[in-house]
Amino acid sequence: MSRWVRVALVAVVAAGLVSLPACGNNNSGKIKIAVVTNCTDPFWDLCEAGAKKAAQENDVELLFRQPERMAAEVQKPVIDAWVSQGVSGIAVSVIDPKGQTEDLTIVAKKVPLVTMDNDAPDSGRICYVGVDNKEAGRAVGRLVKKILPNGGTIALFIGSTTSANGQARPAGVLEELATPEANGTRAKHPLRPELEGKYYGKYFLVDGESKTDDGLKERAVTNARDMLNRVDGVPDLCFVGLYAYNPPAILEAVRARSLVGKVKIVGFDENPETLKSITSGDIEGTVVQDPYNYGYKSVEILAAEVRGDHSKRLKGSAAYQVITKDGGPDQDINGLRIKFPKAVDYERTVRDQLKSVGK
């Protein structure tokens, strides 16, 4: 199939999707607020739950889409169709800020625009709803240091390194691990010289960069499986999954090799499987955002904007949370009050949120 045919098909499918109501009646005369995510994932089911709650409370009609593929060219026709249909406001998790800023700037001149989870700061958006991903990445780095205090070998896994969070999260992890003497120092692995990478403090990063999967969960499992083959026999291993589906994908590969407990796993986001696995001890911990609140706040802000109320705009980053099996007391870290809930308690919260959208 030619590239032009594929693009045309994407546009046709997207146009068909956006013509269907996500909730409510398209002829109701209500304000229409549209939300598009960067892919399909339980993380975004939580976002949808929050968005629906805000839509009810603010008396607006909600259009909510989770694209099947993490690609800007899939997202664009959905947004364009919404603009053409006259929606009142749009929230988007930006996939490629550099590549999408020009198009989003045009959108922002026509309707109020909010970015969430992933930012495009030069797009003219009203505000960003999300955590400081570099700070959240540093929290992941602190988990790694707690698990492997004497150093070790690490591998990072993520969907994309073109998105804002795909760049900031790994950067935060590595900044936390680095020392003045070893901040990306190129080296060969001391036990496996065929493995090249970089040292960040006492931690050897295999290949010196994150392994990406383009949002494809099957590829995420394959990446983890391939890495296990390459580091076979290396002690003090920690695999870090930085998108919501990465920790379960890593765990699937680790279980297949009967290496649970031998390969430590640290995650990002609140995938239900990740939370269950922290409670069971198969995953060490995860740093979570608040996708429910992302959806809620995005809709609340846009509904207020349409009605001339600018007071709901957010001026700073949201606080992340650190989830472990045993939890811990709240801490003040870099100006944010950070909570450390037990996995079993946080899982209950997530389960209740998902029930509200029938998941």
Where are the language model's segments positioned?
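A residue-level marker of the well-folded mature domains of exported/periplasmic proteins
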Residues: 3, 23-359
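C-terminal motif of bacterial Sec signal peptides marking the signal peptidase cleavage site
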Residues: 18-22
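Bacterial N-terminal signal peptides that target proteins for export
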Residues: 1-9
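Repetitive helical segments and hydrophobic/amphipathic motifs
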Residues: 12-15
